[in-house]
Amino acid sequence: FDFFTCGKVSPSVALKIIKEEIQHTNIIKKEFNRDTIDLYHDNYSSPGLNKAYVVNKVLENFKSKVGQYIEILDLEQFGKALFIDNEIQVAESDEHLYSSTFVNSGLKLNPKKEKAAIIGGGDGGVARECISQNFGFIDWFELDPEVVDVCDKHLSKIGEKATEKNSVKCVWGDAFESIKSVKDDTYDQIFVDLNDDQFCIDLAAKNMESLVRILKPKGVITAQVGSQDKKPKQVDSWLNVFNENFGNTQLSRVYIPSFDCAWNFSSSINH
């Protein structure tokens, strides 16, 4: 027996009627979108404002070996974009705003750029920006090589094959395990490009002593900390981590159209 509902009537009403009026062994609920336009829900939507991206084409859609759900979508307004675990990471139309603000936030506090470390940043934008800023050497610690590969394939303008540059050394796997073997006072700049959720905040806080150890005196650590407009408590949590470990932090801000909000970067100098 099939029961079809549409419009503003809640499917739960139909389910209740079926359960009460018809003897059954099981019920299967299916939903489909009759629209000709594919929409992708924006995780940063609020209860009072539901937003979605218009998708022209799905270019990639898979789960990586390390467990991340990776998608490359061709968006109507922003071009090709990387989504990880259902959240936009970068879009080719405005990635330069993100990466340039990220790197320059650190350089404002200390212009030295002999050697940098990048933690995360699988799309390659931060690595490309460091190369364009003429950093001498760049150690890029990335958990998931499949993110890098799929971005090289579909978003090559962002990374510009950064992994193939002589100045870049890629270290695959858990970054915080890998940096245990790095010598003290190695880096002028450290860029932490992890997710801005509480898990990554706690992870960074747990390993901050190691990050301080490998940062040169007067060196700078910069992290992307999310949107102060959308998630102020989350940004405050990041700032607390930096203030507790460095006694200082400076917040930078740039509007990212594909994120539909201003994004923040926190930088601290190692006094």
Regions found by a protein language model. Give the residues of each.
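Residues at the C-termini of beta-strands that transition into short coil/loop
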Residues: 76, 174, 253
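The AdoMet/dcAdoMet-binding core of the Class I SAM-like
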Residues: 3-42, 90-245, 259-261
